[in-house]
Amino acid sequence: MRVLFVYKEKNGDNLFVPVIRTRLSVHGIEAISSVDEFWNPSRSYDIIHIHWPEEVVGWNVNDVDIDKRLETRLRYFKEKGSRVYYTCHNLSPHYGSPLHQACYRVVERMADCMVHLGNYSLGKMAGLYPDCRHVLIPHPIYLGAYDDTLTREAAREYWGIDRRTFVVTAFGKFRRRDEVWMTLKAFFSLPRRKKLLLAPRMLPGSYPKPLLSVIRCLLHLLGVRTENNERIISDEDLPYYFAVSDVVFIQRCVILNSGVVPMAFLFG
């Protein structure tokens, strides 16, 4: 069996797809990650698996006919005998682009099988697309993807954090203003005298650099270490954020799931 994950693997990106691809390979399934292979295939595939429609069409797409092109391409694969799988990470794109919205609907409509990470999307999407097969598969815990043997002491030495400091980490990218306010309110309400919030991707990247610097400095005085939300966290640094933490705070308000939850379990 040959599976195409329509996804471009990049350093510092979410390892969700690479982890699954590696595990499939262990079981003798040929699994490939590529966006180019979707638009210009060099071979046939038994399964075309889409995780994020934005990965397929581009995160900054401006082609008004992109949804039609996407449907044509999916129809091409289905006519060749491929089955279309879709993992429902989000019900809608994070930033609400009408072009991306249209592509989400195309993928949902064309999917032969929809994989859900939780019961909420399964119940909702099964009602909307009853002819599609719907399965629930829990989020993987990234086993083997990172060094999970780090001690808290080693991580604190790495970040230069005193062992008596209570550390809260809000790791994921902040996409909404209410996520920022919820996190800061929770942190400042914490009844600890010596505390630190690590939120490496909290500040909007659209802010001018001088303003970002001022905000970052002010927050630092209040015990918050943060950067802009476009920052890429290296695979080498990632384990240290979790190993150093007393609490991993999940700042999601409306998003279906967060990979930070299983990642936190990986690091204990």
Per-range role (PLM):
Residues 209-244:
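Nucleotide-activated donor-binding/catalytic signature segment of Leloir-type glycosyltransferases, i.e.
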Residues 171-175, 202-204, 254-255:
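Short donor-sugar binding/catalytic loops of nucleotide-sugar-dependent glycosyltransferases
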Residues 68-82, 97-114:
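Membrane-proximal helix-turn-helix segments that form the acceptor-binding/catalytic region
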Residues 112-126, 130-147:
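Donor nucleotide-sugar binding/catalytic pocket of nucleotide-sugar-dependent glycosyltransferases
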Residues 45, 111, 245:
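An anion/phosphate-binding loop that grips the pyrophosphate of nucleotide cofactors and donors
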Residues 146-161:
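A short helix/loop element that forms part of the nucleotide-sugar donor recognition site in Leloir-type
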Residues 161-178, 187, 197:
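Conserved donor-binding/catalytic core segment of Leloir-type glycosyltransferases
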Residues 239-257, 266:
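Acidic donor-binding loop of glycosyltransferase active sites
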